[in-house]
């Protein structure tokens, strides 16, 4: 890990406390530069991102203490949206206020978003690439990566029979019912069953650091979230325009995804492929390429916006839909921060979230079958390659970056041999 430069904040040997971390304010530029480096180097998905954040902000810079960091992680796992990005926004907010929150998000998100927009424009300009063997290899990589996510999340979020059964029920819903209805239905099913039947042990509350958000601002954020959630579908219905429908679909995807990361896949597939915005082949190729990027997986929205067949595409479409998908998570974060200390003490809330998390595993399992498997596994060679890539991810613990590169090279090689 690189050592701090002379311009970095002095790192002392004493652990930070929540009060001290709140008092030590920094500049937006400081926040931007630290998160930009993380945005360029944080490979491995949301769980790995949280590890990078803890090393950087708790161990190295001491912007906050371990208890406060754990509380932020717990809150962002509880909320819909991209958990690692929400933790980053919360750290930026605590360090440099509202402008720091924006700086943290922009710096952490921009590197992978720009790279994916560039990849999309390359595919659009050189149309033959979409059907190339190397691009098909990226689709096969997506099978292995989503399977790994289902495997890991299942072990973590479905540790008992009741939650495993709930995940299976959610998977069946996603396969049998229309996509949008199935996903919402599975989340509601998980919330109801979790609140009614699950009994999770209570956890001690250890941190009481100020949130940096007033209750008035929290209520305003929640109201704005609800207005957009209800108003965007009406706008899309009244205008009958493709752009309004895209904004509504991507906002809804950001608002309904629990767990972040790969869980956004079925929601984005509904918002883009099912509406004819992009082809299934381009969708999976972009999803495979996104695995090789640092930073949040939600930047896949930038690829889809750039590839869009609607009124906006290229840089404008990519940047617009990138912003749209992150808005609900940011609003929910600022709405929840001032009330989290009260919410986390309620057993019903913990049980409900546990049920939703189990349903999320089922939603992702359904997406693994359709569209990921059905679009990528076209023969025995594809199945063998997917199995190899899965083993490298799970047992050899390869980085997704190397798995994606191997998949592209293998796909190209198989294209010559078959």
Regions found by a protein language model. Give the residues of each.
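Multi-pass membrane proteins that catalyze or facilitate reactions on polyprenyl-/lipid-phosphate substrates
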Residues: 1-79, 90-293, 297-418
């Amino acid at each position: 890990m690189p050592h701090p430069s002379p311009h970095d904040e002095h790192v002392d040997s004493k652990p930070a406390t929540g009060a001290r971390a709140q008092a030590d304010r920094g500049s937006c530029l400081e926040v931007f530069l630290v998160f930009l480096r993380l945005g360029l180097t944080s490979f491995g998905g949301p769980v790995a991102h949280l590890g990078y954040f803890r090393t950087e902000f708790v161990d190295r810079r001491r912007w906050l203490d371990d208890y406060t960091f754990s509380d932020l992680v717990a809150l962002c796992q509880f909320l819909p949206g991209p958990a690692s990005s929400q933790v980053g926004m919360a750290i930026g907010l605590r360090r440099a206020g509202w402008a720091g929150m924006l700086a943290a998000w922009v710096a952490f998100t921009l590197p992978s978003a720009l790279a994916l927009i560039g990849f999309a424009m390359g595919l659009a300009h050189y149309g033959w690439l979409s059907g190339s063997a190397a691009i098909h290899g990226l689709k096969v990589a997506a099978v292995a990566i989503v399977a790994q996510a289902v495997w890991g999340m299942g072990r973590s979020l479905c540790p008992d029979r009741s939650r495993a059964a709930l995940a299976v029920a959610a998977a069946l819903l996603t396969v049998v019912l229309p996509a949008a209805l199935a996903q919402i239905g599975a989340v509601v099913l998980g919330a109801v069953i979790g609140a009614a039947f699950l009994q999770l042990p209570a956890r001690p509350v250890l941190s009481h650091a100020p949130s940096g958000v007033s209750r008035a601002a929290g209520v305003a954020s929640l109201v704005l979230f609800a207005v957009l959630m209800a108003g965007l579908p009406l706008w899309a219905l009244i205008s009958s325009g493709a752009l309004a429908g895209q904004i509504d679909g991507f906002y809804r995807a950001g608002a309904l995804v629990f767990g972040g990361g790969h869980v956004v896949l079925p929601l984005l597939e509904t918002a883009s492929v099912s509406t004819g915005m992009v082809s299934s082949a381009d969708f999976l190729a972009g999803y495979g390429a996104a695995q090789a990027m640092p930073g949040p997986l939600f930047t896949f929205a930038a690829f889809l916006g750039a590839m869009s067949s609607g009124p906006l595409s290229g840089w404008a479409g990519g940047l617009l839909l990138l912003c749209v998908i992150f808005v609900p998570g940011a609003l929910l974060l600022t709405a929840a921060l001032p009330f989290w200390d009260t919410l986390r003490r309620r057993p019903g809330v913990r049980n409900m979230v546990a049920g939703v998390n189990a349903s999320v595993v089922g939603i992702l399992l359904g997406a693994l079958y359709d569209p990921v498997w059905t679009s990528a596994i076209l023969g025995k060679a594809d199945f063998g390659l997917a199995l190899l890539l899965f083993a490298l991810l799970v047992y050899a613990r390869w980085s997704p970056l190397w798995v994606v590169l191997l998949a592209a090279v293998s796909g190209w090689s198989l294209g010559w041999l078959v």
